[in-house]
Amino acid sequence: MKRRWSVVQLVLSLCLVLLVAGAVAGLRPDRGSIQRDQAYRQMTERKMPVAIAKHMKRLQSLPGLEGEHPEGPGSAEAEEFLSRAYPNDDIPLAYLDAARSAAARLKGKGFPRGRGRTGTWVTVGPSEALYPATIFRSSFGYVPNRYVAGGRSTALAIDPNCSPGHCRLWIFAAGGGVWRTKNALSGQPNWEFLSGDFGIQSGSSIALDPNDPSGNTLYVGTGEANASGDSAAGVGMYKSTDGGNTWTGPLGASAFAGRAIGSIAVVPGDPSTIYAGTTRGVLGVSSVNGGAVSLIPGAAAWGLYKSTDGGATWTFLHNGAATAAACDTVAEATAVGSPCSLRGVRRVAIDPTNPSIVYAGSYSRGVWRSADGGATWTQINPSLNAADANMRPELAVTTLPNGATRMYIHEGSTGNPSSRLFRSDSVATGVPAFVNLSSSNVADNGYGTHNVCTGQCWYDSFVYTPAGHPDIVYVGGSYSYGENFSNKRGVVLSTDGGVTSTDMTMDATDFLHPNGLHPDQHALVTNPNNPYQFFEVNDGGVMRSSGEFADASANCDARTAFVTLTPTQLARCRQLLSRVPTELVSLNKGLATLQFQSLSVSPFNSNLLQGGTQDNGTWQTPGNPVKWENTMIGDGGQSGFDAADPAFRFHTFFNATPDVNFSGGDMADWNWIGDPIFGTEPQSFYVPIISDPVVSRSMFVGTGHVWRTKTWGMGAMSLAEFREKCNEWFGTFPPGTVCGDWQPLGIPGVAGRLTGTAYGADRTGGFVAAVERATGDATTLWAATQTGRVFISKNVDAEPVTAVTFVRLDSLATNDPNRFVSGIHVDAANPNRAWISYSGFDASTPTTPGHVFEVTYNPLAGTATWVDVSHDFGDIPATDVARDDDTGDLYAATDFGVFVLAAGSTDWQVAAPGMPNVEVAGLTIVPSARKLYAATHGLSAWLLNLP
């Protein structure tokens, strides 16, 4: 049935009211509301709106797709890493060390002075990132209730001396460093940022020293071991003896630099002995670099390390083989037929009854035991699939009343075979017998732990048993989307040793809109005084449970009004929901940890920002430095406004997935315009897409070609028809309808892509990496490709699209680097001049060094001049560039903050005080308002008021 957008919105809102009222009154909804809510339930089946999700599935089945990047290891991260490494295949550790040294040198010079430069970087949030209440999220799908989100958080630790008035909790935000609250049990914990001086803000391990009863001694490992596209490699380990107020480190740089420390264990009774498990790291964090495919020549082998002098020195012990010697070099670990793990050791644990016994879980090599402190090793549980490099075993050990050591193992990879929970009740000696406690049969009690991490175990997985409670075990992973007889089983709890479990993912506060955990789980701890109260970190930050349970099994019967459940499914639903938390509470208020990809600013209000974030969607603020609101779920890529219509917005998810909005970001009004470009050409994971800064309704996007629309993507459709057919939530997407009227500019066909042979035989391939329109005219556009080609078009508005011409500028120079172009800023006064930033390393292109260039095109002579303005910048990959066209000051973003080259100077310096050492993914400048915004990938958004 075709419905107008406004009518549908009204009907669904009314339906929601009726459903809530009916649930309260214990009434069964009428048949009409059931049918409406079946559609409503379908909208929230996944982290994308259902209408577009179904449409994209159809698009993906069409022949000729070549640019779509499936989520999973080896997609975004591989692309981003190769962009940073290009033209090489990898990045030596020496390059990384040189970049850090260069950044430290620049920071040591102080800040620029003169011309009124008194500004300080300030965070503009969000520290209260609000998912507002909406009909588009419910218990049938994604984060069902209003809640405050945080950025991806990967590790946490709780003070052993936790009481209602004083309970310290530490978390590691994936790109946002270490944070602490001293009142984790309060209604609103207060958070402190602790790691501003760390060499990098990425990490995934925190361990308290069990030998310090005060809980003041803790170790944190840098480098995120989760293998996502923005899981940055680390610099080593840091130690604090005062609860995180001060730190020493990095410890073990020779062993850990260029790797990710996924697990740390300090030996009870011997505080000088520490174990650390490392994995292959990822390089960089911004939207133009990174990658889990890296080997990092010059870095130490990944695996298990041991220190016996408090972290001063480290010895390699193990990487999935019986002897250390078999795997103590990268060459051995990567050799064909190697017995070693290709990714490393993800988890280490010490036997609770014998500190000489150590356990290690390594990717694709199962779980191993050493009875002599790591000297020799025996495999005690083989991998589910030794041929799958992503097969990840998580483990937890505990002591049984009889003194034996019990081990739980949660293992999985990309879904085949499905993940499962194992248990052995005697692992310290002999050959342990592990029991598979999981079952794919819904009728079996073991179904609760079946496939908990679905196809993302390489990224989402944990198993945790509270000390002193061996029968209590928590298992975490990712949402089981489409499973209507559970609460998605993101986290499950068993109190009988893993035999049966109940669903902890949503609480009992409401049937349709309970509080819920984010879909992607990473780690969990419990209150030392209550094993049923958990604190959990995920891609949405940190959550806390009430520590009490309620029976929500009646919700299963209510669900049958909306979905069909078999008798077996209904019985399993009642069991899974028979014990759920009475309440789940977000603890994210005060945490500024969102991982922005970029920021856009309204031309009508310099305080009105949008930004896309990793796995937390797109956000908007009218200028509140604390509170932003989510305007679209899922992944968040690029965003923007229109030159003339203040109500217009656009955003992308990933790849070429643009939506447009005509209602100021109202979630109901996002409309798909991606049909001609989604997957049709090679494309970046986050494609460059812009609104024309001068011409209203015009937009440009880069894939293989630069594409253009002059109608906001609507084509000849009226707005009403467009919303009816192409709306993300309600669109009918009828056969024959094309949502989006993008057209490729210039020479058609594969050869005519900006990456193709029509523009030369060199630097071919890849995709368009940057697109920028001049603000001084209506006809000039600059573009660049992944392989370092740079173009200008002087007639980008021409009709037909084949009349648009591009001139390749890099081929007109001899000093331009053959590296990835990360940013373009076009001169507001001269559209033929631009400043271009380069990622990668000078050491990769020694004859053409430089990270920031001033490029001027002479259209009459057909020439271009390239002036390297890097000066003393050093070999630091630049992630973006922005110029203050009023003063001539030039700003460059890096993985170490923002640097400035003052007009007329050859001396790069830190742009301003106030910003910690953090990776900056993008810069957005508003010279007329004297504002420079920085999108950080882990510490939210920042503002520098310009002189």
List PLM regions with ranges:
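Bacterial Sec-dependent signal peptides at the C-terminal "C-region" and cleavage site
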Residues: 21-30
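Beta-propeller blade termini and top-face loops
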Residues: 29-947
